């Protein structure tokens, strides 16, 4: 196994897997669009208080599932949350910080909002509202919640949410491992989870992104860390696409997102982001599910 150390590689490997094939189908991308099985059920709450590292807070499992209360394990990580981020607005605007975490860190199932440009954030909410931004898998809940939320949030709520998340400094919680074999996984809560059985399987042409500690992730800890297992050689292939476009197969990512992939005042950073999330966005642009402003670029 090899663990690359450069943050731009997170974007590179998603590009390396998606762009060269040119004909990825939804079945091929099940790893990027994890779907809960029909018989999926949440674990029951035994009433015990959950803890995460480096936090004095404690929550029951039921409390971490309250969509009208951001689970804030590390209040010192961020400035005071706007009301709509912390608690939403009942009955139909969930707390933004519940899905995306109090400091916007998100997870493989959704977007990391930390440091997104204000103008870009507002435009994405407009695109969700207008129907210009959807998902290639219509029944996928995280995007469905965003579409619903965009239609019930007021412009003022979107404005203060965008200002809050754009003020936060981005950080990464992901390490990349190139390997031919990966742990066996199941889908739980719209993400892949290591079964913990010790069994392995061939990675094929997939990215397998899992939480290092599933309990911390389930507790909605914004500091929960992740591993992205990627096929051998995918990082170098992706890096070529990111930097040069690989002899015309793609526009170099740096053309729009900047030489260090940290974005601009209107274009989002892609450095250090979840490769599963990036893969979904690339595929959604390709299929036309993302057709909003700048998507064609």
Give the role of each language-model region.
Residues 86-97, 101-134, 138-153, 178-191, ...:
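Gly/Gly-Pro-rich "capping" loops immediately C-terminal to redox-active cysteine motifs
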Residues 1-6:
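N-terminal secretory signal peptides that target proteins for export/translocation
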């Amino acid at each position: 196994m090899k663990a690359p150390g450069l943050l731009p590689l997170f974007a590179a490997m998603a590009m390396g897997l998606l762009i060269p094939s040119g004909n990825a189908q939804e079945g091929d991308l099940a790893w990027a669009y994890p779907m809960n099985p029909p018989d999926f059920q949440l674990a029951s709450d035994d009433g015990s208080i959950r803890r995460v590292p480096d936090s004095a807070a404690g929550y029951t499992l039921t409390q971490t599932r309250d969509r009208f209360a951001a689970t804030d394990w590390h209040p010192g990580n961020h400035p005071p949350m706007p009301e709509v981020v912390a608690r939403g607005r009942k009955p139909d605007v969930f707390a933004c910080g519940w899905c995306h975490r109090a400091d916007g860190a998100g997870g493989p199932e959704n977007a990391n909002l930390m440091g997104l440009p204000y103008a870009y954030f507002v435009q994405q909410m407009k695109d969700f509202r207008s129907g210009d931004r959807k998902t290639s898998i219509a029944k996928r809940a995280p995007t469905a919640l965003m579409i619903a939320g965009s239609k019930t949030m007021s412009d003022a709520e979107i404005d203060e949410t965008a200002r809050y998340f754009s003020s936060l400094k981005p950080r990464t919680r992901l390490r990349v491992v190139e390997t031919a074999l990966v742990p066996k996984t199941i889908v739980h809560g719209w993400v892949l989870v290591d079964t913990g059985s010790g069994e392995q399987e061939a990675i094929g042409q997939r990215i397998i992104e899992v939480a290092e500690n599933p309990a911390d992730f389930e507790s909605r800890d914004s500091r929960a860390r992740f591993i992205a297992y990627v096929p051998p050689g995918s990082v170098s292939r992706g890096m070529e696409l990111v930097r040069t476009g690989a002899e015309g197969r793609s526009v170099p990512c740096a053309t729009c997102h900047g030489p260090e992939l940290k974005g601009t005042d209107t274009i989002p950073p892609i450095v250090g982001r979840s490769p599963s999330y990036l893969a979904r966005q690339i595929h959604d642009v390709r299929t036309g599910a993302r057709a909003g402003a700048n998507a064609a670029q």
